[in-house]
């Protein structure tokens, strides 16, 4: 009986979170990412966007997965020549703690150690965020994407420094406009 009550309660919580639709809106000219739930901005973040020659793609996309403690492999691009791969948790890993693909394989939202770049057009096309902000955003995306996790799960992820890919039950829409 207790198990049935717990399962029912868990399903109701998931349905409640899923019913409140999250969408992300990125304004490239304002260098801002808004998290919008049921038409209301619930979080607003300053971001870095693509610079001249490496613009952030515009359009409507979906986030289908969240990757915690991602490794970084230099892309096959001129700017990345001579750079070496960085494992999860490495201080020089430009992805930092989490990344969320919006246009695979090369464009994602991720943390940055270069906080001076926030509010600027400084990236190679990705959307960079402060580490605390991107962590909060990834938690929102997982919650509204049907994969909420308890706080101890996140503590383990941060402590272990191993890559964990979370596929969302419900992709989260993101619109990027100039």
Task: Locate the predicted segments by residue.
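Intrinsically disordered, low-complexity
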Residues: 19-64, 68-69, 150-178
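Bacterial N-terminal signal peptides
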Residues: 5-14
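Short, charged/polar surface micro-motifs in flexible loops or helix N-caps
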Residues: 69-70, 106
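Short acidic, Gly/Pro-enriched loop/turn segments at secondary-structure junctions
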Residues: 71-77
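Exported/periplasmic cell-wall-interacting domains
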Residues: 58, 77-178
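Short, acidic Gly/Pro/Ser/Thr-rich loop/turn segments
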Residues: 70-71, 116
């Amino acid at each position: 009986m207790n198990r049935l009550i717990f399962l029912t309660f868990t399903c109701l919580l998931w349905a409640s979170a899923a019913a409140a639709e999250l969408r992300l809106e990125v304004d490239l000219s304002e260098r801002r990412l808004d998290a919008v739930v049921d038409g209301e901005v619930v979080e607003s973040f300053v971001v870095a966007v693509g610079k001249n020659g490496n613009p952030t793609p515009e359009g409507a996309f979906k986030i289908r997965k969240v990757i915690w403690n991602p490794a970084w492999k230099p892309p096959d691009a001129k700017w990345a020549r001579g750079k070496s791969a960085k494992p999860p948790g490495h201080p020089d890993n430009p992805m930092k703690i989490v990344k969320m693909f919006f246009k695979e394989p090369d464009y994602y939202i991720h943390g940055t150690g270069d906080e001076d770049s926030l509010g600027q057009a400084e990236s190679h096309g990705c959307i960079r965020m402060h580490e605390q902000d991107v962590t909060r955003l990834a938690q929102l995306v997982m919650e509204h994407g049907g994969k909420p996790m308890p706080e101890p799960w996140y503590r383990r992820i941060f402590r272990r420094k191993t890559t964990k890919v979370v596929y969302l039950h419900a992709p989260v829409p993101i619109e990027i406009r100039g």
